[in-house]
Amino acid sequence: TIKVCVSECGNNKKYKFDQSAYTNMSDVGTSYGIVYPGASGDANKATIQYHTPELPFATTVAVAFSTTSADGSSGNAGGTTANGDSMNEYSLTSAPIDGLTLHAQVYDFNAYADGVTTNDQSEEGGGYAATYALGNATVGYGKSFKAPAILEGVRSAGATTVEYYENTGMSIGYAVNDDLSVSYTQETSEPNYMTSATVGYDVEMDSIQLAYSLGGATLSIARADVENVGYVQNTDLTETIIAMSFAF
């Protein structure tokens, strides 16, 4: 299958581990400052993708090529130099045995050469995750990485420049009965600086959630405790979301 998309058709695997009863808390509400890898379906990216038919072990593979869709890539007045960047992305989903699902994604950027700036490091990243369902419980584990673009001129500022981010997620969801589901999720994001002596502070999030079906409505409650928001020591917060959804 060939797809042509703008700002959609994403293949990001950063949340594939998550078994939250309601939602990914780090993706809604207050920003926790966690840096995640990008994907072909991100906003302002035009992408062409090829998705294979289903292969053995319920495996599908996707290959994508993306560009930004701002003025720098069109016949209008030039935008910023980053608008000429492009991305190559490869992703995979597989279910080799009953209950087990595997996900993986990797991408790298081809930096636009403007003849002025030089990248010491072009952006690259990706992630992988595994989930396993047994009875009423499903557990998930995943990791994602992002190495941001770094200009050659800031290499000397290695003590304050992050070389890459490493994110780890663990989650368990349990269906107590046909109406009630509960979950616990933990996420950690670690910044790794170009200078190893630099002290970094991990963002840590713990979330508990429940969802209860009331016939045509579902009541959901989600709470998250977060430490070191934005990788800043002792910048903590607690967030609670209460939601009611209706089926018409």
Label each region the model flagged:
Residues 1-248:
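Outer-membrane beta-barrel proteins
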